[in-house]
């Protein structure tokens, strides 16, 4: 019995306390130029409050998804979203949860959501803009596949009252980004430009607990994640590269394919184990994934974890500038070795 008690870790760190600790560390560092680097870039506490509001929405969404089938939230809502996809019932309710949480915290001035055609301007004095895909992978949710919420945060430009120019900016100007994956457990990955930390929701106490500190992607792993059903529509170089990954030689084993069809689930595995995730352009389009609330946040996380994120041409994702709220891009992101191999292959 004593042995069992000794194995229980009671030195837990919640997301709320982690955010406050990092803010205090920032304040202390800038008073005496000592102390460890921290993740919270703004010492006013406004970003801390915003992150706490986000985690509330993630808890609410996680609870809603767990009960979805029992309370008839599975299926279509009959509404078409900003990108032309027919909304699931869960898309709508989780979008409402997210927007309500952002409007009520007093720190958020602008909201961009996949489910909303236009920019939402909040009646507040907030200094931040939040971009979000409330439920990524919702087309698979009826089958019980893991889905997630992806988010990014910009600080408004100096002197701005809040307009579209505050979000039509390069991804490298985001101050925070992350996602929450809703599966067997709810897993939250967060960065504010200094490391990536992972949290797991303990449903008994209702708190996200720090479980993965300072996450780093493996430099190489022989797994790729891509929808090969579109092979016939890819550029020839891209098709040849994927074929190259599957080649077997005396010196190289073929790569294994792992594709779930939910970006958050596929990327969670890729960040933990390494490898490559890609969603290239099909002929005649500019890609499927949206820059502001899919490509940028994931690229921000991947780079902070030691990986690389580029588009079909090999251009850095975080250097791109979206032309519209729902502008799209191709994307290749993952371990340093795999993405560099792709870049060298297409040159």
From Swiss-Prot:
PROSITE patterns: FBPASE (PS00124). Subject to complex allosteric regulation. The enzyme can assume an active R-state, or an inactive T-state. Intermediate conformations may exist. AMP acts as allosteric inhibitor. AMP binding affects the turnover of bound substrate and not the affinity for substrate. Gene3D superfamilies: 3.40.190.80, Fructose-1,6-Bisphosphatase, subunit A, domain 1. InterPro entries: FBPase_C_dom, FBPase_class-1, FBPase_N, FBPtase, Fructose_bisphosphatase_AS. Belongs to the FBPase class 1 family. Homotetramer. This is Fructose-1,6-bisphosphatase. It comes from Schizosaccharomyces pombe (strain 972 / ATCC 24843).
């Amino acid at each position: 019995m004593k042995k069992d008690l000794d194995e229980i870790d009671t030195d837990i760190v919640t997301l709320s306390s982690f955010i406050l600790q990092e803010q205090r560390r920032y304040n202390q560092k800038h008073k005496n130029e000592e102390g460890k680097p921290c993740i919270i870039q703004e010492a006013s506490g406004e970003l801390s409050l915003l992150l706490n509001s986000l985690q509330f929405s993630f808890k609410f969404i996680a609870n809603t998804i767990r009960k979805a089938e029992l309370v008839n939230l599975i299926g279509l809502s009959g509404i078409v979203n900003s990108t032309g996809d027919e909304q699931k019932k869960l898309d709508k309710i989780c979008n409402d949860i997210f927007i309500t949480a952002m409007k009520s915290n007093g720190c958020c001035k602008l909201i961009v959501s996949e489910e909303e055609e236009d920019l939402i301007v909040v009646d507040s004095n907030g200094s931040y803009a939040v971009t979000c895909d409330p439920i990524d992978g919702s087309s698979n949710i009826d089958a019980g596949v893991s889905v997630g919420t992806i988010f990014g945060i910009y600080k408004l430009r100096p002197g701005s009252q809040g307009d579209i120019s505050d979000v039509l900016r390069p991804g490298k100007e985001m101050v925070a980004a992350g996602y929450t994956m809703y599966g067997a457990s709810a897993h939250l990955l967060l960065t504010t430009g200094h490391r990536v930390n992972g949290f797991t929701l303990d449903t008994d106490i209702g708190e996200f607990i720090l479980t993965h500190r300072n996450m780093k992607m493996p430099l190489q792993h022989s797994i790729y994640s891509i929808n090969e059903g579109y092979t016939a529509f890819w550029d020839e170089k891209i098709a040849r590269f994927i074929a190259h990954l599957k080649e077997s030689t005396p010196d190289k084993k073929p790569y294994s394919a792992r594709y779930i069809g939910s970006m958050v689930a596929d990327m969670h595995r890729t960040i933990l184990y390494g490898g490559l995730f890609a969603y290239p352009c099909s002929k005649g389009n500019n890609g499927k994934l949206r820059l502001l609330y899919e490509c940028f946040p994931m690229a921000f996380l991947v780079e902070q974890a030691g990986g690389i994120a580029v588009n079909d041409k090999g251009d850095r994702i975080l250097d791109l500038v979206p032309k519209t709220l729902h502008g799209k891009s191709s994307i290749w992101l993952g371990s340093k070795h795999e993405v560099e191999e792709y870049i060298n292959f297409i040159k």
